[in-house]
């Protein structure tokens, strides 16, 4: 794995007509840190007092329109949405040509709105920084935050440079250049397997599966399925970064169906199937919805069993009817897969806290999910039941047996055993 030895190309994105002093300062810091700033101007009304690498006219053209047409669109919201569309298309093209080593954007709410779109289309692993007056605030929908995005509060930054602003901007620019210089590109030495899970207090199969897969010559990346982790998993799947996946914690689908903010977006369980990646699926933690522990419990869940994991996140079981609905959603997603899918159903339970005597034990509700899943899965999907809990060795062994069979049949590429 190698890091950049030359000057990394860093996109510097902002409205040069209103923030020229700050953007020029950022470009200077990037150069002094050993990077090559590539200025992209997303102004609408005015012009920057410098020559950007890509002008607002280039951005508008990438959106299939003109700056004047954008001005005539009627209001600042629609105008910035069009500029976001153009900037995203422009940056996507640069990235596909290998001309982006990192990005940093500067903005208030309008600039942040635009920058979130750009960060979302850059591949996982490309350093992404946004310096924003609303960094990590409640204004940002979780599903719009790229999984490896870094944000820094633009403290005291409106209307020109000052000592606080210089400190913030210099830190951010130094960070993006340093990240671009030192980032290690993922190694292709061994095939990569993706796996989803929660922490070992809830799900434990990875303790058995990871070393067994590594013995077979694979690297294994395990994603913490609490919203952002699922988003990262989906991003790598969309890039065809896995040779196979063990998607054993699909709780984020339950979260999405229940309206929780702990979401990985509407495309959870969809990118591996689109990419033609073989999938082994299990319903880990599908019986509960995660909510912020510091918020009031929504009315619909007030009477449901509740477990606070810590001061940040709490789990609430969903009703039998909701579990049936989730089963139908999961089955519908799997039907669209372009590669083999195996669904393994552990009839003894789907997470550690649903065991007999534990706070989330609801055998009738679990039975509702199992029953609905049996009827919803079609014959195009390999369906296996295991008379065991998902955390039992029997479950992990069955999953590994399916994987080994797929390797023997050539469905999954063989591992690289040293």
Swiss-Prot record:
Pfam family, one: UPF0261_C
Domain of life per record: Bacteria
Matches recorded under CDD domains: Tm-1-like (cd15488)
Family (UniProt): Belongs to the UPF0261 family.
PANTHER family in UniProt: UPF0261 DOMAIN PROTEIN (AFU_ORTHOLOGUE AFUA_1G10120)
Protein name stated in the entry: UPF0261 protein BRA1168/BS1330_II1159
Species in which this protein is naturally found: Brucella suis biovar 1 (strain 1330)
Upper taxonomic lineage: Bacteria, Pseudomonadati, Pseudomonadota, Alphaproteobacteria, Hyphomicrobiales
């Amino acid at each position: 794995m190698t890091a950049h030895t030359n000057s990394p190309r860093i996109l510097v994105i902002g409205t040069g007509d209103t923030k020229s002093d700050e953007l020029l300062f950022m470009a200077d810091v990037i150069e002094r840190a050993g990077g090559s700033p590539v200025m992209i101007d997303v102004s609408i009304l005015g012009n920057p007092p410098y020559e950007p690498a890509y002008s607002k006219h280039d951005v508008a053209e990438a959106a299939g329109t003109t700056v004047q047409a954008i001005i005539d669109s009627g209001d600042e919201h629609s105008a910035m949405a069009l500029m976001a569309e153009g900037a995203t298309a422009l940056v996507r093209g640069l990235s596909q040509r290998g001309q982006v080593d990192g990005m940093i954007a500067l903005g208030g709410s309008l600039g942040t709105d635009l920058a979130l779109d750009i960060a979302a289309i850059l591949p996982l692993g490309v350093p992404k920084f946004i310096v924003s007056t609303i960094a990590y605030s409640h204004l940002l929908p979780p599903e719009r935050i790229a999984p490896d995005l870094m944000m820094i509060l633009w403290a005291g930054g409106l209307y020109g440079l000052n000592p606080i602003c210089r400190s913030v901007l210099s830190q951010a620019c130094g960070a993006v250049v340093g990240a671009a210089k030192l980032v290690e590109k993922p190694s292709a030495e061994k095939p990569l397997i993706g796996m989803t899970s929660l922490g070992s207090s809830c799900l434990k199969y990875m303790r058995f599966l990871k070393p067994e897969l590594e013995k077979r010559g694979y690297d294994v990346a395990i994603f913490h399925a609490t919203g952002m982790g699922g988003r990262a998993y989906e991003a790598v799947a969309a890039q065809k970064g896995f040779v196979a996946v063990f998607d054993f914690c699909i709780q984020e689908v339950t979260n999405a169906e229940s309206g929780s903010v702990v979401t990985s977006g509407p495309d959870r369980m969809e990118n591996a199937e689109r990419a033609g990646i073989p999938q082994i699926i299990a319903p880990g933690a599908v019986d509960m919805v995660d909510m912020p522990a510091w918020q009031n419990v929504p009315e619909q869940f007030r009477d449901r069993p509740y477990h606070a994991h810590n001061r940040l996140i709490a789990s609430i079981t969903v009703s039998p009817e909701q579990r049936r609905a989730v089963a139908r959603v999961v089955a519908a997603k799997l039907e669209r897969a372009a590669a083999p899918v195996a669904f393994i159903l552990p009839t003894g339970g789907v997470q550690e806290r649903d065991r007999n005597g534990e706070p989330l034990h609801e055998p009738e509700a679990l039975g509702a999910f199992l029953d609905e899943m049996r009827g919803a899965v079609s014959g195009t999907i390999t369906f296996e039941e295991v008379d065991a809990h998902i955390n039992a060795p029997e479950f992990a062994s069955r999953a590994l047996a399916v994987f080994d069979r797929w390797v023997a049949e050539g469905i999954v590429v063989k591992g690289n055993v040293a």
